[in-house]
């Protein structure tokens, strides 16, 4: 009395999950490649005195997320700006950049190509910690596929003192 899930790989169907608990209605299939489509089939079963009875299969195609952005770093930090750098995601159309401010994540930029791998956030306050996150996206036949977000933290530097401030200390 449960469910069996099969994944089509290597030219054949392989059982990847089985439960005898009919209240379990989801599972996670691991070791899949990013930005790939897979065929799955699911069927219910019931154990009887005469053996196991199976329902018909329900088939579905699933698409995995894009690979996460790799190598995200906050570099070129100044008193009022942070430069974000990351590695190219070969499958991406572009990248979405967000900043955490006011208690929520706010989109601050979207790149429209896969070759822009830096973004400088300007107009920041001195000596202040900030959080940024980046995810890749891919436009694919009218649908958009996303990676998960990757987060980086950085603190802006203390600005320079005005020259009259330094001379007033003497």
Predicted regions and their residues:
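Beta-strand-rich modules
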Residues: 29-48, 121-141
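Extracellular low-complexity, O-glycosylation-prone stalks/linkers
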Residues: 1-18, 24, 41, 57, ...
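Pro/Thr/Ser/Gly-rich low-complexity, intrinsically disordered linker/stalk tracts
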Residues: 34, 51-91, 126, 142-170
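Tandem-repeat/low-complexity and Cys-motif detector
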Residues: 18-19, 28-31, 47-49, 64, ...
């Amino acid at each position: 009395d449960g469910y069996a899930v099969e994944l089509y790989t290597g030219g054949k169907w392989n059982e990847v999950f089985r439960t005898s608990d009919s209240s379990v209605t989801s599972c996670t299939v691991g070791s899949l490649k990013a930005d790939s489509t897979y065929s799955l089939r699911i069927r219910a079963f019931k154990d009887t005195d005469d053996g196991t009875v199976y329902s018909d299969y329900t088939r579905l195609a699933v698409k995995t997320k894009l690979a996460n952005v790799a190598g995200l770093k906050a570099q070129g930090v100044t008193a009022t700006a942070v430069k974000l750098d990351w590695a190219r995601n070969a499958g991406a159309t572009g990248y979405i950049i967000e900043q955490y401010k006011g208690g929520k994540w706010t989109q601050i930029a979207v790149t429209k190509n896969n070759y822009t791998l830096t973004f400088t956030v300007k107009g920041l306050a001195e000596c202040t910690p900030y959080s940024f996150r980046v995810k890749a996206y891919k436009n694919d036949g009218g649908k958009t596929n996303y990676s998960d977000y990757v987060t980086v933290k950085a603190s802006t530097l203390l600005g320079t003192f005005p020259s009259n401030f330094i001379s007033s200390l003497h």
